[in-house]
Curated annotation (Swiss-Prot):
Family: Belongs to the herpesviridae US22 family.
Keyword ATP-binding: no
Superkingdom of origin: Viruses
Compartment(s) of residence: Host cytoplasm; Host nucleus
Stored Pfam families: US22
Protein name, UniProt field: Immediate-early protein 2
Gene this chain is encoded by: IE2
């Protein structure tokens, strides 16, 4: 995997306190954009955040409803559109083979060297090979022991390569599949004896790439959340604290219960992950308070379907709100976009929201239009039938 040396720590501090320009990457970089990785990426292009956000919101979900990561933010979106169909077909075929007991390893060895295109990033391929041929069986076993969330043995699927790259370089990431079908990416670390070795950036890391091979086919590597060993893994942008643990570890946390907990911790803040390849961290401020006009719009359009639980800002010191965060009765998280007035589904629950931030944006403008033209006694359904409302 290509490694890009980053900016100084002073630049990172400057970014933390107000420099929120996007730093778009042309290189293949898999670090999540949390506070841990500010200043690490190559500064190849500067964009106004408002412009990029606007383009993202215009493009998202217009044609590809299932691809909900921030692929649309990236400069490679046209290439992604062209590659998507082939990538999905290849991943679907591989998924079919993996469902046959004991056949996956044989398939990988029979098709050793086959190159399957990734949906993202552009010009990257999964070069099929087995753990035995790659000499990776011991490494896979070591990862299984170090990362409890892997939950069983890991099967090597292949190596991520670009055009003309050699299989035998130890810098290329290795794709693995867990026992339950979860896809992981192992970024092999640089040798510790390298002159400029940095343990924070150059140690080997494990990423959660996708929940399944089907998701991997649609998304490629645009997710790649960090995986940690503590408590079986927690890819949050902010360190876990007792308040966060108390919320996310509460079983069957519904919307009303979450709203009540938010009321108790009013003003608490956490960092949220931004888009892969961009310095776009955001801060979630837990608060049940929203301006009267926002409350009025929500009541007018949705009745008592949502309860406010907070807002998203650019930094802890920045009072300007980018998005108000709401929860429905089933615990799903929604964002009210102030610039467009749209309400978009962000996550299935609060834990997922804390992991994904505002990266996963599902447009519900279709239902929004239906609400406007539908009598208040027949409001359209915005989620699972079990969601209900707070009335």
């Amino acid at each position: 995997m290509e490694r890009v040396r980053g900016a100084s720590s002073s630049d990172s501090v400057a970014t933390l306190h107000g420099d929120h320009n996007y730093h778009c990457m042309a290189t293949f970089k898999l670090d999540c954009t949390s506070a841990r990785t500010r200043g690490v990426v190559s500064i190849l292009e500067h964009r106004d955040p408002a412009t990029v956000d606007d383009i993202f919101m215009q493009r998202v979900c217009h044609d590809i409803n299932d691809v909900l990561r921030p692929v649309e933010c990236l400069t490679s979106f046209p290439e992604y559109r062209r590659t998507l169909r082939v990538a999905v077909e290849a991943a679907t075929e591989l998924h079919g083979v993996s469902a046959l007991s004991g056949q996956l390893t044989k398939f990988l060895e029979d098709h050793d060297g086959a190159m399957l295109p990734l949906a993202w990033p552009p010009n990257r391929y999964l070069r099929l090979t087995s753990g035995r041929k790659l000499g990776y069986l011991d490494v896979a076993e070591k990862l299984r022991k170090e990362y409890p969330m892997c939950n069983g043995p890991l099967e090597v699927l292949g190596v991520i390569l670009g055009p003309g790259q050699s299989l035998y370089s130890d810098q290329h990431p290795v794709l693995l599949m867990g026992l339950t079908g979860t896809i992981f990416l192992h970024a092999r670390g640089r040798p510790v004896w390298s002159p400029d070795y940095d343990p924070e950036r150059d140690a080997d890391r494990l990423f959660l790439a996708a929940e399944s091979l089907q998701s991997f086919g649609r998304e490629g590597l645009c997710r790649c959340d960090n995986v940690y060993t503590e408590d079986g893994g927690a890819p949050y942008a902010t360190p876990e604290d007792p308040v966060l643990k108390n919320i996310v570890f509460t079983p069957h946390l519904g919307g009303k219960a979450l709203h009540q907990q938010i009321c108790k911790i009013k003003g608490h803040t956490w960092y949220l992950n931004g888009c892969p390849g961009m310095l776009k961290d955001r801060v979630f401020v837990a608060t049940p308070d929203i301006p009267p006009f926002v409350r009025h719009v929500n009541l007018e359009l949705f009745g008592h379907r949502f309860l406010p639980i907070g807002r998203v800002t650019r930094s802890p010191e920045d009072p300007e709100c980018e998005m108000f965060i709401m929860v429905d009765a089933g615990g799903a998280i929604y964002g009210h976009m102030l610039d467009s007035g749209k309400v978009r589904r962000l996550a299935d629950n609060f834990d997922q929201f804390m992991r994904m931030g505002t990266r996963r944006v599902i447009s519900i403008s279709r239902w929004l239009r239906e609400v406007v033209s539908t009598p208040s006694t027949r409001r359209p359904r915005l989620g699972p039938r079990t969601t209900g409302s707070f009335s």
